[in-house]
Amino acid sequence: MLAPVLLLLGAALTGRGMEADLPATGDYAALELYTRLAAQGRQLLGPYSRFGFHHPGPAYFYASVPLYVLTGERFAGILLTAALVNVVSIAFILRRLGRDGGMPALVAGALMLALFLSWRGPAWLFSAWNPNVAVLPFGVALVGFAAVAAGNVRALPLAVLAASFAAQTHLGALPAAVAIGLAAALLHVPLVRRAAGLPPAGPAAHWSLLLATVLVAVVWTPPLLEQLSPEGGNLSHIFGFSSLPGERHSAGEALVASGAAIVGWMVGAREGVATGLLVVLVAALAVAHGVARVNRQPFPAALSLVTFAGIAAAIVSAARVTGALLPYLLRWMAMLAVGGVAALASALGPLWRRRAERWTRPRLAASVGIIALALVSGRNLALARSVLQGPEPVPSEESRSAARLAEAIDAGIATTSRRPLLEIAPHTDRDLVLGVLLALDKTGTRFAVRPFGPFRLGGHWTPDGTEDARIVVGHEDADLAARPGVRLLGREAGLFAYLVPPV
């Protein structure tokens, strides 16, 4: 199953990029700017959101720092980090399913993950976009908390770390991450545990609880520090935004969108059919729990309940999304289908084994599953090869424009300013501006920049009163250009940079 991933990863390590080496504009430029701050230990915010706040925390940026530095501060390091996170997540998911759920859960989980990669394309594993990076770590959290609920408290540290990473990287995963964690905790309450048909929990592994607590403290300290700082308040902004009484989606809309995101992708189902498939998945969870309860199988029983909690949280989250229910916002929900199918396979495993004893070909069922997995993985391998055989990606014209304008700004202030303040005019092409800022920083140009749009570039870019000039970046401004001493430094793709001398 991992052959396509390893093929692409090996190609990337030998110099074949999955994307242009420096997609120096837009979202990727913002990700790289924040990673550069993390390399200095100054990044306290998560990825920016189009709604004006930032996602809850910077775990993704700090995870990207080692490979970013090792690759010479190239964007390829962030792409490789995304691939590494995904490959390791797949390995952890399959390891947990195999250890606690047995061979049926392992084969079913591997088949579902292979189908997911076939749907998205193997190159998706190299996507550095934060909604994509959060998907597979959420899957690690799902199966990890299921193991904790089943009685394996040693799985708690990894489950907490994966849930925190997914929630900090993409806010949409936060409610479900909290829900599955709470479900696992509730299933350790003796009364709830008996009602759920789970065996009594063994003695608590104190080192696991201690390690999980330390991980939570370390991972969540940066966003808490930002919240408590005088110029901070991102977590309050998130809470306030989520509490706004604005337009929300109906239960029907949430069910349709959630059904498509959770299970519809498996068969390319339309919205109406996807809702029906979601009902089938919930019924399968009920069957899995009932069978596991009868056969006294703690892991599939716990996995079915934890997955159900995740589905409920996913539907509620979809109902509270502001604006259109775009697929990328809900993509993390696909891991709930992986959990549901694995729970059903694990629960039915003993029944299949007992029936197989009466068959003349007792390994037929396992063989069918492995053959199906091989077929899907073979298709993924073919897709990966087609990616590698395609033309090398080249930087876009927007990237070239950003580099040229940054070069003009750097040349214009080399002898006139030690540290200018950049002001971004309203209604400016933010994608291009981000590329300019990234290119300036990579050349070693010292500058400060005021927050603009949803972007808050702190650290060494924070204005501190030492700025000795002002650069206004925006659309052409004839009135500003006519002022005494104002000089046009450069213009590219409709973006103008004016040097305004100090008053």
Where do the protein language model's features map onto the residues?
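Extracytosolic helix-loop segments that constitute the early lumenal/periplasmic catalytic or substrate-binding loops
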Residues: 13-15, 29-54, 58-62, 66-67
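Transmembrane-helix motifs of polytopic, lipid-linked glycan transferases
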Residues: 80-101, 140, 287-291
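Membrane-interface helix-loop-helix junctions at transmembrane boundaries of multi-pass membrane enzymes
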Residues: 97-106, 152, 191-207, 273-274, ...
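Transmembrane-helix signature of polytopic, membrane-embedded enzymes
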Residues: 93-117
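Membrane-interface alpha helices of multi-pass inner-membrane proteins
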Residues: 156-173, 177-184, 215-218
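Transmembrane-lumen/periplasm boundary regions of multi-pass, lipid-linked membrane glycan transferases
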Residues: 34-37, 190-199, 207-280
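Loop-to-helix entry region of an early transmembrane alpha helix in multi-pass inner-membrane enzymes
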Residues: 58, 62, 71-91, 124-130, ...
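Membrane-interface transmembrane helices that cradle and orient dolichyl/undecaprenyl
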Residues: 141-158, 191-195
